[in-house]
């Protein structure tokens, strides 16, 4: 049977990006686009053209305005999930942010009247989580080398949050990517996007020079061998009805 790719593709388009999610019985596709740069009919035409004969249904339109609450906990109401905010789905943060909203709320559930200090702490935690997700999303766009449409030219000139600008410049100048413990996205995720988008470092961490000769090559060789052995033992992704 034909194997199913075990990953989702994100494909840059004229005014946004297209997702392609392999499912057991079909491929899920969608186009997240900026209505400031492309109208609905143009977006539908671009998506339909990319799918060709594989399209099975008329595209549905889901409009959204990204953002978050100024205060997630206000008096006796706490906003969770889509009531709290929504960021575009490039990194699928909605479920995780909903879980964080519940997880961080549980220790603060009051027996009586809410403690305003706890309310403030909760709001600060949730605001920080959304800001972290926002910065990581913006990273994908500002580091893109595309300049062929107005959308991508605007992305290159977007105002970056201070934390994002600092991290990009730190990596470019030193080769280091410092991510505080407990952040939404790990150091590996940040490095994968920056290096994948062509952000290069002028230097590398000094401790690479003090390692014994051949140590790094030996370590990377063993790591590659481990991955290759694991891959040999893994089964292909295939439709459930065709799996043996």
List PLM regions with ranges.
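Surface-exposed beta-strand edges and their flanking turn/coil or helix-capping segments
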Residues: 33-35, 43-47, 72-74, 92-95, ...
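Central beta-strand plus flanking loop segment that forms part of the substrate or channel wall
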Residues: 1-3
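Conserved FAD/dinucleotide-binding core of flavoprotein oxidoreductases
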Residues: 11-65, 83-96, 108-111
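Tryptophan-centric aromatic hotspots in well-structured domains and transmembrane helices
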Residues: 17, 73, 77, 141, ...
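Long, low-complexity C-terminal extensions of enzymes
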Residues: 107-244
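Conserved mid-domain beta->alpha element of the FAD-binding
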Residues: 67-133
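Short, low-complexity intrinsically disordered segments
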Residues: 15-17, 102, 150, 188
